[in-house]
């Protein structure tokens, strides 16, 4: 099962910290940095040390269950994305399973039985705070797990529903390892720079009172005026949106003269 894994520097650093961590570990890494690879490398290392260890991945959607199973297979880890609570334990011919947070909410007792001593990965853990019942179910289902690795693409807070297995400072989740967009950009070949140009323009619309009004985005308006201005700007029948798209297209063509793969 074990095979060489080429890790980016941040993944190797995170894996080193994870190896000496306690039961729970939260890794926050910018989208596209390779959270899945890091998590599977951590699981592979842990399972190599204890071949009896089973792996359970919790993903946000059914589509991502299949993606996780495919990614794990490239590491020599075979996960069942079709597991159901009616199943009698974990499949004996697999290393583990992939479920969704919704499945956890309705199958916590069954998962608690199979998660004892297991390695659990929570993908986009902030989803567990979407509903109070999801967080409670996650706690019940994976309290018996031996190791719990939580992943997120961005720092998050929980104003109302605290997420289990996550350490907080005030309302802010405290990651054990963080790799931000700036870090990834500085490393090169991890993420690409993103450019957000500001675009102004003058919008003209007729209010409910029949009065014709005009304003740019720089003008201060009340809530009603701001809403009307935005609707006017985004109207498919107006001129502003077309002008913005034309300008963006021209800017992209110009950028591609020096960076051929810009914008795609």
What feature does the model see in each segment?
Residues 1-28:
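Conserved pre-motif I regulatory segment
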Residues 101, 111-157:
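SF2 helicase catalytic motif II
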Residues 31-46, 51-74:
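Conserved Walker A/P-loop ATP-binding site and its immediately adjacent core
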Residues 62-64, 102-105, 126-127, 154-158, ...:
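Conserved nucleotide-binding/hydrolysis micro-motifs of P-loop NTPases
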Residues 27, 97-99, 120:
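Hydrophobic positions in the central parallel beta-sheet of the AAA+
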Residues 21-27, 53, 95, 262-264:
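Pre-Walker A (Motif I) flank of P-loop NTPase domains
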Residues 72-110:
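Inter-Walker segment of RecA-like/P-loop motor cores
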Residues 2, 160-263:
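Interdomain helical connector at the RecA1-RecA2 junction of SF1/SF2 helicase-like NTPases
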């Amino acid at each position: 099962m074990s095979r060489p894994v080429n890790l980016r520097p941040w993944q190797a650093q995170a894996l080193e910290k994870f190896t000496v961590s306690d039961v729970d570990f939260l890794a926050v890494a910018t989208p596209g940095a390779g959270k899945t690879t890091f998590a599977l490398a951590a699981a592979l290392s842990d399972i190599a040390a204890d071949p009896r260890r089973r792996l359970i991945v919790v993903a946000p959607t059914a589509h991502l269950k299949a993606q996780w199973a495919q990614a794990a297979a490239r590491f020599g880890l075979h996960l069942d994305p079709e597991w159901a609570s009616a199943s009698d334990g974990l499949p004996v011919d697999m290393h583990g399973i992939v479920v969704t947070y919704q499945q956890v909410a309705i199958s916590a007792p069954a998962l608690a039985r199979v998660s004892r001593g297991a390695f659990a990965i929570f993908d986009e853990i902030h989803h567990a705070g979407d509903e109070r019942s999801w967080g409670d179910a996650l706690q019940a289902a994976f309290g018996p797990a031996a190791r719990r690795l939580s992943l997120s693409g961005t720092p998050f807070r929980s104003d109302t529903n605290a997420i289990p297995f996550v350490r907080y400072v005030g309302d802010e989740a405290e990651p054990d390892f963080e790799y931000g967009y700036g870090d990834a950009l500085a490393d090169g070949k991890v993420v690409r720079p993103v450019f957000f140009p500001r675009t102004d323009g003058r919008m003209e619309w007729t209010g409910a009172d029949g009065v014709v009004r005009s304003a740019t985005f720089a003008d201060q308006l009340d809530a009603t005026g701001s809403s009307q201005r935005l609707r006017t700007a985004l109207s498919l029948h107006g001129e502003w949106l077309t002008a913005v798209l034309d300008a963006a297209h021209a800017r992209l063509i110009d950028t591609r003269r020096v960076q051929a793969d810009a914008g795609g």
